[in-house]
Design a protein with these regions (language model features):
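ABC transporter nucleotide-binding domain
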Residues: 1-67
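C-terminal coupling/interaction segments
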Residues: 55, 59-99
């Protein structure tokens, strides 16, 4: 897995170097932007329209979403450790416009 074997990561977009550093350093830079929250099923569509949803897990009680956002996406959201997938989504994903 790249996260464990890479000594340095470069993030480029449109030919421009956005970030460079060790995986640990770069992941720390987005630590406060990765959230999880348990939400009722009816909230999912609204959150998907307004935020980058990295993951969705179903359970009997609620739906757990992993969201990339610079602000808390939901009142009960909590910060979680970022992964390289989260890093990729932070820099390259766009918020869905499912209209």
């Amino acid at each position: 897995d790249v996260e464990y074997i890479a000594k340095e990561i470069l993030i480029m977009k449109n030919g421009e170097l956005l970030r460079q550093g060790s995986p640990e350093t770069i992941l720390k830079s987005i630590h406060s932007f990765v959230w999880e929250c348990d939400v009722p099923r009816q909230e999912i569509e609204r959150l998907e329209k307004n935020y980058i949803v990295a993951n969705l897990k179903h359970s009997a009680e609620a739906e757990r979403l992993r969201i990339i956002s610079e602000v808390s996406p939901y009142t009960t959201a909590w910060n979680v450790e970022p992964t390289l997938e989260d890093l990729y989504l932070y820099y390259f994903a766009e918020v869905s416009d499912n209209e």
